[in-house]
């Protein structure tokens, strides 16, 4: 939402857009400190005041936490514990590329946190990853991997994202590791847009049973929310 500093809708505007797209649930995941202009950690201390249902759309509260060098998270545990779920991802604005092995090790270290349920956009060869290691870690630590529609829209910025997703999806299918497919909407007009991601899944024959957010109960069970 607006709170992240480079997005352009409020929570209620995002929920209204989700209703228009006939979505049952939306996750609001502001960027954690480390991204310019985003929220202070104190923001996560008062999430309870936000209605759990807006315009008939269920609201879950997450955070996209930055992977830092040394395998550290960019948000303190006391704030992470207030979330419904945490996402971890590498962002070049607050991370120095350590090569395939180092990047993968740092990401996996963050995935060990029990509140972490998702890895965001693991697709960009500007910070390359070892996909066999990543998928095996996702299986071990019960973390799902994201197929990010916005990455495919801006594929000129996400180096080799299509091929990286094909590699990742083949491994997820092999080892039965779940994924989420999402818009990564930073404006209400993008909420629910998953066209390129869904086309990619169809092109590789990906098993829909491994797509967590194809089924509301399956998604909520995985996230551990009621």
What kind of feature is each model-predicted range?
Residues 1-2, 31:
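Histidine-centered nuclease catalytic patch
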Residues 6-9, 37-41, 128-136, 155-171, ...:
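Histidine/acidic-residue-rich catalytic or RNA/ligand-binding cores of hydrolases
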Residues 14-26:
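Catalytic domains of carbohydrate-active enzymes, especially glycoside hydrolases
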Residues 19, 32, 37-147, 151, ...:
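Extended substrate/RNA-proximal surfaces in nucleic-acid metabolism proteins
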Residues 24-25, 29, 117:
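Short acidic/polar active-site loop segments enriched in Thr and Asp
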Residues 31, 177-191:
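Short acidic/histidine-rich active-site segments
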Residues 165-183:
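Conserved short secondary-structure transition element at the edge of the structured enzyme core
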